[in-house]
Regions:
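Active-site-adjacent substructure of cysteine-protease-like catalytic cores
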Residues: 114, 118-168, 175
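Surface-exposed charge patches
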Residues: 73, 106, 126-127
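Noncatalytic regulatory segments and standalone regulatory/sensor domains
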Residues: 35-40, 158-204
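Anion (oxyanion) recognition and catalysis
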Residues: 109, 129, 186
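Mid-chain, structured segments of secreted extracytoplasmic proteins
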Residues: 88-123
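Active-site-adjacent structural segments surrounding the nucleophilic cysteine of cysteine proteases
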Residues: 27, 31-97, 122, 141, ...
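Sec-dependent bacterial lipoprotein signal peptides
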Residues: 2-32
Length: 204
């Protein structure tokens, strides 16, 4: 009876976890609002409603290599080239299955960039986008006690539709609702990285 009771409790715990996971997915879909829209629908007239940075290349991430993919997008925007394999060898930590923010910044500095990292706000993020600087943001896609860090390259926003546009390593020009973005960004400490070639005079 004791063994049966423990098994029943374990099954109940798994059922509860599954319920809350599915509930979180449903709530995320609801609060995403306009995030279901395709970017091609939002693109016309976006400069009136926000801003979009053209010319930021998209790199498809492999496995958990969202950090290297985000770096490659920023490098490509500034006309610099580095393969995902080269970037991965420099910043990816297999034992963590990910990349640390400090290593992202160090790589960009070694590549000849001035960098700014901070715990920003949505308004500060939009200011940087308006100046034409793509911004790497760290999100946490997990829920509850479960963490799932994920880097995205933010390249636009649309105030009228309350969405962020970002290359997320899986999809180019992914549309993310402000509420969803804020929640995931908050869980990761609002970390963001802006990089500008060291020779440029435009860094704010």
């Amino acid at each position: 009876m004791i063994l049966y009771s423990k098994r029943a409790q374990s099954a109940g715990s798994r059922a509860n976890m599954l319920f809350f996971f599915l509930l979180a997915m449903v709530l995320t879909a609801i609060i995403s609002g306009c995030a279901g829209k395709n970017f091609s629908i939002l693109r016309p007239g976006i400069e009136v409603r926000g801003h979009y940075i053209d010319g930021v290349p998209f790199y498809q991430q492999k496995n958990s290599l969202c950090g290297p993919a985000a770096i490659a997008s920023v490098l490509g925007f500034w006309g610099r080239t580095a393969s995902l394999d080269q970037i991965t060898a420099a910043v990816y930590l297999p034992e963590l299955r990910g990349t640390l923010p400090m290593d992202m910044e160090h790589f960009m500095r070694e590549a000849g960039f001035d960098t700014i990292t901070s715990a920003g706000t949505l308004e500060e993020l939009k200011v940087r986008i308006r100046t034409g600087l793509p911004v790497i943001c760290l999100l946490d896609l997990g829920f509850g006690p479960y963490r799932q860090p994920h880097y995205v390259t933010v390249i636009g926003f649309d105030d009228a539709n309350a969405v962020i546009i970002a290359h997320d390593g899986l999809k180019a020009n992914s549309v993310i609702g402000y509420n969803t973005f804020e929640n995931e960004w908050t869980r990761a400490g609002h970390w963001m990285l802006t990089a500008n070639p060291r020779s440029s005079k435009d860094m704010q």
